[in-house]
From Swiss-Prot:
Keyword Transcription regulation attributed: no
GO biological process: protein transport; retrograde transport, endosome to Golgi
Similarity comment text for this entry: Belongs to the VPS53 family.
InterPro entries (alphabetical): Vps53, Vps53_C, Vps53_N
Main location class: cytoplasm
Protein name as catalogued: Vacuolar protein sorting-associated protein 53 B
Quaternary state and interactors: Component of the Golgi-associated retrograde protein (GARP) complex.
Gene Ontology terms: cellular component: cytosol; endosome membrane; GARP complex
Length: 569
């Protein structure tokens, strides 16, 4: 406490002089307070000394407890290591026991399956001797399943012995099945019905054997069924078209007679289809031989009749044994597939195609005769009043040309077969459309120039025929029905304004209009490629004779004779 503070305290305690009378009592009070504080300090110091002693004792106790805990931890660690070693020993023993259990289980299972296999082979041997095909098929499937479990033990003597025994039993089964099939058709009707049921069961056995056995059985059966057909026609000298009908009748009779017998085979084998494929191939050879060996030119009507009968026969086969889908020439391989569909279109009838030339020649001859008739019936006197009738006729011919173009473009699809290759159809159709468009474009251009007014005929001609000559332009003016004076006036104007032509061509050229019939004559290959009957050619020829033939006749005659009323309604 500084001096000022002490003075302030004294002044506060003794503000007036009269208060100094209480100094002694005040001093006594202060002394008592000092003694109390000293006693408190002494008690605290004494207590603190006792606390240090207790703290040292507590520290010693804690050190002892820590040492004891460390000792116990060491003991626990030691016991844990001992326990771990014991567990490892136990696990090792358990693993050995697991391997032993697995080996024992495998051995027991293998022995059990071996017992079942031995028993099944013995039962199969008994069934084979009794020709119990249905039971043998089920047993053979079970044996094949059991044999799959012994693939890893094929070198064991017992397994090799069983395999050899099973192989011999399968050979015996195969022999019995083939023997029963060879006896088909040699017994009475009752015996045949019983044998058919038996052979139907034997097919189950063949399915359980190797695939090669099934193929061999099918080939043998087909060869046997074809024997009667081959005895009649193979090697025989066939010369006339009438014999084709006899062949189809014989085939239809053979199919009807044996169709019930073919049902013994599973559908997945496709035996009727494969048999009919072979029949169709042999028939194709015979029909082709007849067509090649014809000594004189065959009658078109009779040839088309036999072609129609061939197509009908193919449709009959397809309805009974096909279903549409893949190409008939593709013989199915082994194994079969229920999802496959087949057809017989074109297998026999395709051999007629090289011999249809006479039909095409006949159609061309009839078209040319009709063309000549149309030309001969026309008179070529000039009529001054032609006028609007000519223009109306030209517009009508433009419509006819457009309709004819649409008909020609539809020709490839009129009798298109659904199973034809998409790429082949697309390529053929594209080339055919290009040909028709090219040929018809020029015909339509000629008609448009003819239909144009006189004042714009030059501009129309230059726009549609930029590379043509005045000679071609003059011929179109003739077709337009103009007088010579009108033609000369227009030609002079054409030559004066032409930057490319300096003089009229006097060389004798074939008129371009003569190329127009190509749109008709080139239709024949496309029709032959896509159509199956003469209906398509008839429709195309009919359309051509209504309008396009008129244009062809007109352009051919316009070179030397004046225009008449060919365009009149």
């Amino acid at each position: 406490m500084d001096k000022s503070s002490g003075l302030d305290f004294i002044n506060q305690m003794f503000p007036v002089e009269a208060s100094l009378s209480c100094v002694e009592s005040f001093m006594q009070k202060i002394c008592d307070e000092i003694r109390r504080v000293d006693a408190t300090i002494l008690a605290v110091v004494s207590q603190q000394g006792n606390s240090g002693t207790r703290a040292k004792e507590n520290l010693n106790d804690a050190i002892c407890a820590a040492e004891e805990l460390s000792h116990k931890i060491q003991e626990i660690k030691s016991k844990a290591e001992q326990t771990e070693a014991m567990v490892q020993d136990i696990c090792s023993d358990i693993k050995k026991l697991d391997f032993a259990k697995k080996n024992i289980t495998t051995a027991v299972t293998a022995l059990s399956r071996l017992t079942m296999l031995v028993s099944a082979v013995q039962q199969l041997q008994v069934m084979t001797s009794k020709r119990q095909y249905k039971e043998a098929a089920t047993q053979l499937e079970a044996i094949n399943e059991l044999c799959n479990h012994f693939k890893a033990y094929m070198d064991l003597p017992k397994i090799m012995e069983l395999r050899e025994k099973l192989k011999n039993i399968k050979q015996i089964l195969k022999f019995h099945v083939f023997s029963d099939f060879s006896s088909l058709g040699t017994g009475t009707e009752t015996e045949e019905l019983f044998l058919l049921k038996k052979l139907s069961d034997s097919c189950l056995v063949v399915d359980a054997l190797e695939p090669s056995v099934r193929e061999e059985l099918i080939n043998n059966f087909c060869s046997r069924e074809l024997t009667s057909y081959e005895q009649i026609y193979v090697g025989a000298e066939l010369k006339t078209l009438d014999e084709i009908e006899l062949i189809y009748n014989q085939l239809s009779c053979l199919i009807r007679k044996n169709q019930g017998k073919w049902t013994i085979f599973p559908a997945s084998w496709h035996v009727p289809y494969r048999l009919c494929i072979q029949l169709s191939r042999k028939t194709r050879v015979q029909v082709e031989s007849i067509l090649v060996n014809l000594k004189e030119k065959s009658d078109v009507e009779k040839l088309l009749l036999e072609l129609k009968r061939t197509l009908e026969f193919e449709r009959e086969l397809e309805m009974k044994f096909g279903g549409g889908g893949s190409i008939g020439d593709d013989i199915i391989g082994g194994g079969g597939n229920n999802s496959q569909k087949f057809n017989f279109r074109g297998m026999i009838s395709s051999c007629f195609e090289p011999h249809l030339t006479i039909y095409i020649e006949k159609e061309e001859m009839e078209l040319m005769q009709l063309l000549e008739k149309v030309v001969q019936e026309e008179t070529w006197d000039i009529e001054e009043e032609l006028g609007c009738h000519s223009e109306n006729s030209v517009y009508l011919m433009l419509l006819d040309a457009h309709d004819m173009k649409m008909i020609l473009l539809k020709v490839p699809s009129l009798a298109r077969q659904p199973e034809a290759s998409a790429l082949l159809v697309k390529t053929a159709t594209a080339s055919y459309v290009k040909l028709v468009n090219h040929q018809m474009k020029r015909a339509e251009a000629v008609l448009k120039v003819i239909a144009s007014p006189i004042v714009t005929v030059i501009d129309t001609y230059r726009a549609l025929f930029p590379e043509e000559t005045p000679m071609e332009f003059q011929r179109i003016l003739v077709l337009k029905g103009l007088t010579k004076a009108e033609q000369q006036s227009i030609l002079d104007d054409f030559n004066n304004h032409s930057s490319r032509i300096t003089q009229l061509s006097v060389a004798a050229k074939t008129p371009e209009a003569h190329a127009l019939p190509l749109a008709l004559t080139n239709v024949a290959p496309a029709v032959r490629f896509k159509a199956n009957s003469e209906e398509v050619l008839t429709r195309a020829a009919s359309a051509a004779t209504t309008s396009f033939m008129k244009l062809y006749a007109l352009t051919g005659a316009a070179k030397d004779r004046p225009f008449r009323k060919l365009f009149n309604p």
